[in-house]
Amino acid sequence: MKRTRLVAATAASTITLAMALTACASDDTEAPADSEETTSESGEVEPGDLTLWVAGGDTPDELREYLVDTFEAENEGSTLTIEEQDWGDLVTKLTTSLPDAENTPDVVELGNTQAPTFTNAGAFREISPELYEELGGDNLLQSFVEAGSVDGTVYALPYYFGSRYMFYRADIWSDAGIEVPTTLAEFGDAVTELRTDDMSGFALGGQDWRNGISWVFANGGELAVKEGEEWVSTLSDENTIAGLEQWQDVYEGASNVPATERDVAYWDFLNDKAEGGAPDAATIMAPGWARWSIGDLTENDEGEEVRDGMADDSKFDIFALPGVDGGVAPVFAGGSNMAVSAQSQHPELSENLLRIIYSDEYQTMLAENGLGPANTEFNSIMETDKFGEITVETAENSKLTPAAPGWAAVEGASVYEELFQKIAEGGDVTELAAEYDETITPMLNGQAG
């Protein structure tokens, strides 16, 4: 559910960072040897000053205040400082700070696609089986648990999830006599028909692989699989190629957005232009929070001009991307994981903070604020309107990127952006798949590409 995504400088730099972490992590990642945390004669943990890093602005102030107040009330004499880190700088900051016991944050939020690299590098303290069960166990979102695990040992837990679905101009679709599609092919036909010189039927940047891989997943394809001890890029798999070719057709037929574009504020495309006339797009694909940037202009309680969150459902509406044969297509799941630094000098206090984060009260607050809770037992809280219902529905059908140790290097080098741009520009998908398989496979296994 990130609003911006990790873009590191190069693959080599990301791999170097992971190697540095590996070198600094011991075989026993449960706690650093020089941990200063002590217990009193009564067995209670001595007070300490804990630092939590949150990524971006998705955790509302209300939730941050709750964490600070509750932690300090339950851990007398201890303090909690919450520091917000920009998504774009997060990997670099984690890599320089996590190995340093003097400067490491104690508990960190990181993206679900970043978690495998850091867990494989030994950056995090193990979540014991007993603590795992206490914090939710198998009710925790399992795809995110897998992203934070190595060989069955859990190091990073789900924090929150978000999903993506289709936002569309219901008035424009209705005027064109087009119904909400029930298959992926019908979707492609519909948005191609809606396209004009001034309006995308479906606004999609050519480099936007995070939306584009939904076509791969819907066709039964994978980005990579683990064969024995090695990860292998599977772009050349026939199902993956089918998905990429279908995405290519949709991009070429429906989008006016340049092939060079990636992180596009698609939500703006649905809104009426200030000067009047048709919007820039009839359809977009975006995370659920995009709703609050879409709609007619109104004033909030402070007198500020804001969007009304799609209040007019005859004008703005949503639907899940349909699958090849109907149902709901698997989409890429956004969201975050939460972990304790292996070098934290306050491991027990850190675990106490986790107990608050995974408490019924905090999970309820996440759901009430539109953030998919880590504990799936609280999903029903979100299902009070169509937005919550579709978030849960699409999340239940979502998929993650491969949990390979080198995945952050692939993302950091913008390899998929490059591949999807070439596909958007009309490149031969089969040839490009073979070429990029050779590039990506060694990177997935922590080797320079």
Show the residue positions of the predicted features.
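Extracytoplasmic "Venus flytrap"/periplasmic binding protein-like
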Residues: T70-L140, A176-T182, K273-G276, A282-T283, ...
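A structural signal for short loop-to-beta-strand junctions that line the ligand-binding cleft
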Residues: P105-D106, E134-D171, G201, P322-G323, ...
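Hinge/lid segment of periplasmic solute-binding proteins
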Residues: G111-R164, W215-V216, A311-F319
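Short, solvent-exposed loop/beta-turn-alpha elements that line the ligand-binding surface or hinge
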Residues: P129-L140, E222-A242, D249, E299-S314, ...
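Conserved C-terminal helix/tail region of periplasmic/extracytoplasmic solute-binding proteins
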Residues: S174, E396-G449
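Extracytoplasmic ligand-binding clamshell segments of periplasmic binding protein
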Residues: D198, L223-N300, E348, L432
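Mature extracytoplasmic/periplasmic domains
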Residues: W267, W289-D308, F332, S336-V410
